[in-house]
């Protein structure tokens, strides 16, 4: 049960399949010389994504969907698969430390202590992964992904039942970042239903991750999050963001590009993939496949 960076895991042979889960359905890819993509919608109410409560509301429907996508995979020897969870099912934070211990146990203990006041669930029993980056003025920035163990386990369970081993688990936005240019100071705004994930990255280093449920997926509600984010960037990083990447805006992408460019004074473009336009329910999967292509 691991939530981890993609690059360190992609040094090994890629898994047989990869799945991205959303309330709308499950996006899947059979990984080989050429990836075979599929998407199976879920009945409304099967999942309700949250970092605080049960996500799988209809386990039987979820299990049937997983088995349908797995096909003959379930009849073979148990194989590793990659599992991409919804952003809103976990919390991603970037913590800065004046000094960061070398011992992994001390690191984990220090991180959990820092998160106790900001994470609305029990951090001691939660599934957690993290990695360190060089920070400003000699500090260490640590990217932390944490989720209640019960939530992660419920997402994993149908895949294990179907004869698969979720050997790599990550979140949609982290996987989707593999589609973003690794240059300059950029912002990714990823919309999935009413959940907006905003990721600030300076070249390959994460600086800020926000994931919140909006009152509605309207332009006004998205702008109300982006404006203070861009102010934060300028105030804390000392310069303006150079590019805003959009994902999940669907038919409203062109309107969003024009409006955000005008209101934020930044270059705006959609997130792109060689395998098609990344959408609100498959951007993480396409990013993961891009990583495999780049690292193999």
Report residues per predicted region.
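Hydrophobic/aromatic-enriched cytosolic interaction surfaces used to assemble or bind macromolecules
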Residues: 1-296
